[in-house]
Amino acid sequence: GDYTKGKRHTIDGLQAPFGVAVDAQNRVWVSSSYNNKLTVFPGDAPDKAKTIEVNLGGRGVAVDSTGHVWIAQQSNSPQGALPPGAKMPPNIPANAPQPKTIMEEFEAGAEYLLTNPNITQTGMVGLISPDMKVVQQDIAKGTAYIPWGVSVDGNDNVWVGNLYGQSLTHICGVKPANCPAGKTTGDVIHNYQSGVIQMTTDVIVDDAGNLWSANNWFDGEVVINPTYQGRTSTFGGGQGFVVTYGVAGPVQNPLMGPVRRPR
């Protein structure tokens, strides 16, 4: 195509759009950071958008080989419920207006982290059927802590960059035969943590089954603390990419539409 002839579209349902995926029917699936809608529209007819109610604060979106869609959600309900025992920062009122910029959003998120030092989970992963029905909404509940990026591997299992959880979460997909014995769709297979996995955002699988993940932050407190942190003052930004060798089912790249195994 000719990129100079592109057009900006206003799509009903979008509010701070974040993740994008395209399925085999050429439908575009888009999450929104600032509402509880997953928006779906034909690639050749963006004016015919439909929405699905999900939990407030959508992030990464991925399509598996069967057309099911997986979405990272940063809260515990469509209304943005917090986990038991969690509280909002004192300077953020109830029903606060949405942040105006991504940095304001990060600041609010970091304040939530500091206000709740004993909380270890917030958010979960959702599974949507090809006919746009919610199949499961609370996947990885208890493990997910601000889940961010989502990728599907060649076994149709799911990988999530678990930002505040500082981990890579491996989830059994829609083909339990490809999962360890006793695991079924939506079960956490393993939650990978190590000294090199920091505050992770996006994650992707290559043709050899290696998992690549982005360390976005290193030390969350250093990122937002207004006072000098001494010897840790340079620990703000994350330290590059992490490759976890051979843990995922190989994927045919480049990824165009639903995930595919290498030929």
Predicted regions and their residues:
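Flexible "stalk/tail and boundary" regions
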Residues: 1-263
